[in-house]
Amino acid sequence: MNNKRHSTNEQLSLDEINNTIKFDHRSSNKQKFLSFLGPGLLVAVGYMDPGNWITSMQGGAQYGYTLLFVILISSLSAMLLQSMTVRLGIATGMDLAQMTRHYLSRPIAIIFWIIAELAIIATDIAEVIGSAIALNLLFNIPLIVGALITVLDVFLLLFIMKYGFRKIEAIVGTLIFTVLFIFIFEVYISSPQLNAVLNGFIPHSEIITNNGILYIALGIIGATIMPHNLYLHSSIVQSRTYSRHNNEEKSQAIKFATIDSNIQLSIAFVVNCLLLVLGASLFFNSNADDLGGFYDLYHALKTEPVLGATMGAIMSTLFAVALLASGQNSTITGTLAGQIVMEGFLRLHIPNWLRRLITRSLAVIPVIVCLSIFKGNAAKIEQLLVFSQVFLSIALPFCLIPLQLATSNKDLMGPFYNKTWVNIISWTLIIILSILNVYLIVQTFQELQG
């Protein structure tokens, strides 16, 4: 990576929200924290999107609480990587897409852009599928109609944006806590064994020695670090009004943005643990092989003998509501990430509504085509979701490596470059994640062919 300085005519990242939310570095720590509370919520959404649900609940259903340790390690890794994106955005005034385009040669940057766009589409496919299935479960709306309805989310986002970025953060936060409280309630009703849950956070050798557990563990790790989140976070932290030329204010902004990120990712960690605990407490040692998708989980909850007819109906309905909330949340953040990638790599100046409509349409089209070919077969649609998650694994190194190279560059980052211990941990994470993702991709295609 060369050391060209940031050009003065660089377009602001997400310029309609950039530098719009007040941050007073002279205020109390409480006020500073509240000023920066919000971007982490949008990032946390990617760690509990519909694409993560199946892996966590299947892991619990098939292997009990063993994989809670993997969720813990994955979440801690995510916190480190997201803190690096915070420093990149605040220290340089560029998001990850802008930085990649600006500091890499044009041919390489174009390759990275194509992969980033495909990753955004893959992310959006999971949200479209999750929302369409939730609408089908709740209101019996055909899957094709449900997928088309999700296009309207784009215009809803445009409408909300007129009232400021804080409104988006508030709506996302409300939906996140809706999902959180639903699963707290469902786990409470399912009565898990506390000692067994706590034991799950201790590493077990079976995670490595048992191929089945290892496969699910890789799925959890691969689904935890989402490429679009790295682009998103490096942009939306710039929505606050800290001085772009004062290192003291930048330092404070980095501090409170990182605290915000870690708090929200802790909530995502709890949600993923709750999903696994719910799967383990209700389905471990029974029906685990039948929990292949959202419909299987919905009907398993509805007919679970331990719950009874009334509570089973409530639990399954709440599951569908949480799925819809998660899908809508991820729709908002995925659309924003699509805008960041398109603007950052291409410097395209097109109307916001058109840019967001293009992003969503590119995700809806493959879902509609798949539904048409397979005549609404839910299993085939859920298989498309699996393919989308596999592609995210392929795309991951193409944003992690530029992030690492940029944040370890003293000329680019100034006093906010990575310390040695951060470089050691982050490079180790990148290498391990890349190896595990390659293994996961190979295993997934072998299973699909088998």
From Swiss-Prot:
Q: Does the keyword Ion transport apply?
A: yes
Q: Which InterPro entries match?
A: NRAMP_fam
Q: What is the membrane topology noted in the UniProt record heading this document?
A: Multi-pass membrane protein
Q: Looking at the keywords, is Transmembrane present?
A: yes
Highest taxon in the source lineage: Bacteria
GO MF terms listed in the record are:
cadmium ion transmembrane transporter activity; manganese ion transmembrane transporter activity; metal ion binding; symporter activity
| Alphabetized UniProt keyword annotations | Cell membrane, Ion transport, Membrane, Symport, Transmembrane, Transmembrane helix, Transport
* A biological process term (GO) from this entry: iron ion transmembrane transport
- Intracellular or extracellular location(s): Cell membrane
Q: Where are the transmembrane segments?
A: 34-54, 61-81, 108-128, 141-161, 170-190, 212-232, 263-283, 305-325, 361-381, 383-403, 422-442
Sorted alphabetically, the Gene Ontology cellular component annotations on this record are: plasma membrane
- Family statement drawn from the similarity comment of this UniProt entry: Belongs to the NRAMP family.
**PANTHER family reported for this sequence:** NATURAL RESISTANCE-ASSOCIATED MACROPHAGE PROTEIN 2, SOLUTE CARRIER PROTEIN FAMILY 11 MEMBER
**Record's function text:** H(+)-stimulated, divalent metal cation uptake system.
Q: What's this protein's name?
A: Divalent metal cation transporter MntH
State the species of origin.
Staphylococcus aureus (strain bovine RF122 / ET3-1)
What does the organism's lineage look like at the top?
Bacteria, Bacillati, Bacillota, Bacilli, Bacillales
